[in-house]
């Protein structure tokens, strides 16, 4: 399916995703220990979970701009070094404020990842493969979340939660050195394969970034991605604490059980891009966005219903099953948001527009965890938080049907006709 010279790029990007969520999930797994050691309330813990997304969301956009200007390879190298160092710095936290600051800086480091992956895929692969490649590379993230539970949980119980953050830092720094040494920005055959690999627009076209930032297709794709991230951050940050605090599980049991949704998420994200590309090939006459919307709306709506009901069931097994299925359907859409941007944006702007979309989407990571902590403190239960996450995603999936459409026309001063209407 993919040529041998491109497989290392896929592997490195996949492993970057694994490390990304190994780092990011570690705090959630270690949260019961950290809360006790630093004497933090649920509201304070929610603010710490949210603080990550303050730096993360801002650098989603700035990282995308940097990947367009300085190249995805260099941008991702710097990002990995920064986030690995601040992952290790979590072990130095001595209170609420210090941990809050470290998590903001850690989020800044992780921010450029998705936009740089999107840019690298755009550099290396033709449009017919991009959703599949994005799905495969991004599937590393739920796998990282899956292995984070057992690894961090066992290390925290056997040694200390601080040790796990130092080990994860070392893994990230090793990846950064190998990435910089072995991966190229673009394939050597780019010139020969230019008609297949580059975006539909020609190099001479100058379409301003602001043209895309005002398009409903970009804005409502970002809104759907916001709903996706609201569910994801709810699961990522609070689900371990929900199992321990509301369901009464031990940290050891929680560490094992959290693997189940992540494994289904890994399968969903890896398969989602292939499903979208397959639907596209079968419905090509209806346009590429039709296939993206079919997968996105169906799966996001299903995820929303499942997560909403998960907070209402009486048994732990039922709640875990519904959350796991919700994560599976959620991750089936994971590659689609990026594929939509690939489909409607020219090559010169794809990193920046993707970063802008990701920035808007990840404000959910600022709002969601803090709001969940507040809801839990006020009500003493997670039920309302589950229902809010599901309701938001239902609304977003319906908005996609109405507003995500091909971008027809061109901004004033460009030469191409309908450059992004395919």
UniProtKB/Swiss-Prot annotation:
Induction: Induced by galacturonate, repressed by glucose. Gene3D superfamilies: MFS general substrate transporter like domains. GO terms for cellular component: plasma membrane. One of its GO terms (molecular function) is transmembrane transporter activity. Pfam families: MFS_1. It is a multi-pass membrane protein. Keywords: Cell membrane, Membrane, Transmembrane, Transmembrane helix, Transport. The keyword Manganese does not apply. It is found in: Cell membrane. Signal peptide: none annotated. It catalyses: aldehydo-D-glucuronate(in) + H(+)(in) = aldehydo-D-glucuronate(out) + H(+)(out); aldehydo-D-galacturonate(out) + H(+)(out) = aldehydo-D-galacturonate(in) + H(+)(in). The chain crosses the membrane at residues 9-29, 45-65, 82-102, 141-161, 163-183, 219-239, 256-276, 294-314, 321-341, 356-376, 381-401. InterPro entries: MFS, MFS_dom, MFS_Na/Anion_cotransporter, MFS_trans_sf, Sugar_P_transporter. Transport of aldohexuronates such as D-glucuronate and D-galacturonate. NCBIfam families: 2A0114. Member of the exu locus which is required for galacturonate utilization. Belongs to the major facilitator superfamily. Phthalate permease family. This is Hexuronate transporter. It comes from Bacillus subtilis (strain 168). The lineage of its organism: Bacteria, Bacillati, Bacillota, Bacilli, Bacillales.
């Amino acid at each position: 399916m993919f040529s041998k010279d491109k497989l290392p790029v896929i592997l490195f990007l996949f492993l970057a995703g694994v490390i990304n969520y190994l780092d990011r999930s570690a705090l959630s797994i270690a949260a019961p220990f950290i809360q006790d050691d630093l004497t933090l309330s649920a509201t304070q813990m929610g603010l710490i979970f949210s603080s990550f997304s303050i730096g993360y969301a801002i650098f989603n956009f700035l990282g995308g701009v940097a990947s367009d200007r300085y190249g995805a390879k260099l941008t991702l190298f710097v990002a990995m070094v920064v986030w690995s160092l601040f992952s290790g710095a979590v072990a130095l936290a001595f209170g609420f404020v210090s941990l809050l600051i470290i998590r903001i800086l850690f989020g800044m480091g992780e921010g450029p990842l998705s936009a740089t992956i999107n840019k690298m895929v755009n550099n290396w692969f033709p449009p017919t493969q991009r959703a599949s490649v994005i799905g495969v590379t991004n599937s590393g993230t739920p796998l990282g979340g899956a292995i984070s539970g057992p690894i961090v949980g066992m290390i925290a119980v056997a040694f200390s939660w601080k040790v796990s953050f130092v080990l994860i830092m070392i893994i990230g720094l090793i990846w950064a050195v190998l990435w910089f040494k072995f991966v190229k920005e673009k394939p050597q055959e780019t010139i020969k394969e230019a008609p297949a690999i580059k975006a539909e627009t020609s190099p001479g076209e100058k379409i301003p970034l602001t043209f895309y930032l005002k398009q409903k297709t970009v804005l409502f794709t970002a809104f759907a991605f916001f709903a996706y991230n609201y569910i994801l951050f709810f699961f990522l940050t609070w689900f371990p604490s929900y199992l321990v605090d509301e369901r009464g599980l031990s940290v050891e049991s929680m560490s094992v059980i959290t693997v189940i949704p992540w494994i289904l998420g890994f399968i969903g994200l890896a398969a989602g891009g292939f499903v979208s590309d397959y639907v596209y090939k079968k419905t090509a006459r209806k346009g590429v966005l039709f296939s993206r919307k079919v997968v996105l709306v169906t799966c996001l709506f299903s995820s929303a219903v499942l997560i909403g009901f998960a907070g209402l069931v009486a048994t732990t097994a039922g709640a875990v099953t519904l959350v796991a299925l919700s994560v599976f359907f959620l991750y089936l859409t994971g590659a689609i948001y990026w594929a939509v941007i690939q489909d409607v944006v020219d090559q010169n702007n794809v990193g920046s527009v993707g970063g802008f979309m990701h920035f808007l989407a990840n404000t959910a990571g600022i709002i969601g965890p803090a709001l969940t902590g507040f809801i839990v403190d006020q009500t003493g239960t997670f039920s309302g938080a589950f229902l809010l996450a599901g309701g938001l995603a239902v609304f977003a999936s319906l908005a996609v049907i109405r507003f995500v459409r091909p971008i027809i026309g061109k901004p004033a001063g460009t030469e191409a006709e309908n450059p992004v209407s395919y």
